[in-house]
Amino acid sequence: VVKRSRPFNLLVAASEAIPYAKTGGLADVAGALPQEFVKLGHDVILLLPRYREVNRSGGTFTPVVTLPVQTPMGMLNAVVEEALVPVGERRMRVWTIGHDSYFDRTGLYQEAGVDYPDNLERFAFFCRAIIETMVYLQRERQWATDFLHLHDWQTALCAVYLKTTEAGRAELSATKTVLTLHNIGYQGLFPGS
């Protein structure tokens, strides 16, 4: 056991988490595990897409910042909002990344049983927005992400970006990543074109 003088800063990124958005077991784990980290004394931010379904969760979200996100489709805005959730005597921050054309939809990943044709584009944007959120946290809030805990294919590109296109950014250099795969059947496979 390694003793630390301060708790870890943990950014937990998932495409769904209870009670905000759920299609399966991923939401159960992604909603419960961050709260256990908080109970252990760590500073945790749970980061999710700002789906339409989030509005029905009962959480009260307030604006934090609008971040520019560079994508293959050009520069897009990510609207970051925050809710504070009590966890015992502590609080956990839940942040959402909003971009209406990607996330303000009937379903999380599909509609009428058919996957959205732009799921790769949607979650590549989400991953880029996660990276920009980490930079914002470091620069503007002096909150360096010690561990980025990613869940399933929808967030896995973050690990790739940190080792490739974002490897030179000082704000991200000390961040360690953990990728949890909840169901190997969902791999985020898309045509090459």
Please place each PLM-identified region on the residue numbering.
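Catalytic cores of nucleotide-sugar-dependent glycosyltransferases that transfer UDP/GDP/TDP-activated
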Residues: 1-193
